[in-house]
């Protein structure tokens, strides 16, 4: 018997060691180099924005967490190895057939490498993983109270939001660390002879037994702690088959006691395991572990299953009633749907209305939105693009401004950005791409309630948006013909200009002006960026770093870069906000607005949690999906939340990229915690200027989440909630080309939050009855500064047509389909239905409005820009249809109903040009042919009796005769035609 001699490992030559070190250095450089470059670039970028404290706080937190986790985990594993080695048997039996001997020799030959390298590698891996949880740790350190306690344990919700996730993280790391130490100790004892196996027998040294048993005992103790924490996590747990989130009857009366029992059993088992140290009998801990396993199966799984099947399911509505009430209360609190925010009012939805009542709703009828921002983008591009490299997004935005008469109006708005992907030929050269074509030019707004001219008139090319433009004019001065004055219309930052792989522009004074700005009849004018934004690029260090970052040698050799040069990058507004506020989830919709004569992008930011007790866990991607998101591939990343607040409003200056964060929700505990983590980065709500407040709108994604939850959580009675009989549904988009839910719409209409006739900017949505196509409710979210965030829900008790039924009634009406069939005959024009708006009018009625567009040909090519040709409406079961809002309203309610509707803007016979005071460069490429003139449409109700149809034909003939007489100047014939028209209208009104 003796110690087996260790086999010597072959030694490496000095040359081999040098080559290995060089290879390792190259590998480290390849792995770490890009990260070091990115870190340095981020240091510069955050500093330029004024948010370097965010970068340093995140970096310091990540480094500290990585080091602490690495040292702790690696140290525990090292301890397991070191103990096994230090207590190894002095003499190991020598056996020729010992399979462990060769491994023992290898380990002994490289003892330091194995003993330190393995724990170090494990610690490094653990640290890298742990640093990704930096936010959880910061919330634990800075989180406060919610001021609300959970209904089961009476703990403040801050415990669940900030403390419990941290405790669970620490417990997970301790379990993994001790388990790895156990494995390392076990393997080390086996290699060094503390554990010997021979056939069916084996031997275990005392030190091996003590160490392994101790580690198992610690694991069992940690499992007992896990059972204790499991109790709290039950409150955000979802059991299969439950219609609500949180602990139900089975969880409280079976699972919760089971967790306590299992915790007690785990403590007993831990004592049994530790007893093996003194008793030298491994059967006792083995029995304890088997008992723990069986208990977890019987007590932890079997008993709750029996309670669920025998006691709960036969009486589920009564048994779960208390817990459903908890879920209703918590979900309303977590998603901002409490009674101080949401106001419910009964609304008939089908009350009869007179022409006078409709006309009196001036705030609604004068603001009926005709322009669909998902359809009119090609028209913006055709008439306002100017050059091939300017571009508008496929889906435009809606905002509101005061018109020249001081009336609140909604506008379809867009920034004319530069799209690098549309550069062609020599424009794609590196110098042109990054130093010449650097910015967009112009803010375009179109009143959403009107168009230029009537498409029904064959002598006019009407139906197109009326464009109000802020742009750099032909003489180099800023022309502000838009809805608000703008000092600087050049756009260096935006979602379109940043939508490319090489998102950067090199700007700054270096000799003559280089940047393309605008054209005159004589030459092209250049410009030099003068904004404060941008990272200095003049030094050789900066040039070298950015050359490496973008893999572009021109940074080093191009003479267009001088001492005053700057580089603009990371130009997407939402991404800039997410970078300086990494704790925010941003809304999918970013929109431009003129604020204090500056063009800014407004970004909505959310704080979220995923473990709010009893609050329903919601998938953001599912809740926010609608037909627009699907069509434009703008779905938000999947994220589960059970708490959400629109806590931050952010602005990004379109010229210099300045990011400003404003506190929107002053009560949000999550935001307060982050404001302590990053002090000074979020400005108080009081700093929001009135000019900015006038353009803040209720965020779309939040509204979609809330309407989905209101479909269930408007119910107060838990028994009714359980039966789902009074639930609502988000309606599907009735448009035949849509494939998802109907999106909410921003409109200006009468203020239903105040229940008066003042104009209000709102975000609205209809709600259907559960699995039905009839209306159940109408939801409006106010964006007015005085009532911002108030939700008004009009509950509709009767059987009122929902969006799908209204759309079916409009599109299948014989007169409508016949008229549109003529317009689209032989694929001359492509007919498109716009957004179907639901508008409360009169006192108790709901008016459906759906604009109709046509574009040349049957394709959806970009050149086929659409124009408005008809307006369709439905009120109760009656359909109105005409070239204008006034015509459709008159057809529905009679003469005078459209008196307060906004009239059509004048136009000329030709295609409307860009505003004369501010002509952009002419659009490149040939102009597409105009839409074939639509035939006159019958004005009036289209659900008609034969007598009314005959009367309408007479009306149409009389109108035609009057037009002909007017053109010829035959006043006698004109008077006769008017008399026949009056008689025909009388026949129409008298017809049954």
From Swiss-Prot:
GO terms for cellular component: extracellular region; peptidoglycan-based cell wall; plasma membrane. Residues 906-938 are annotated as: Disordered. Keywords: Cell membrane, Membrane, Transmembrane, Transmembrane helix. NCBIfam families: PRK00068.1, PRK12438.1. Belongs to the UPF0182 family. HAMAP family: UPF0182. This is UPF0182 protein Rv3193c. It comes from Mycobacterium tuberculosis (strain ATCC 25618 / H37Rv).
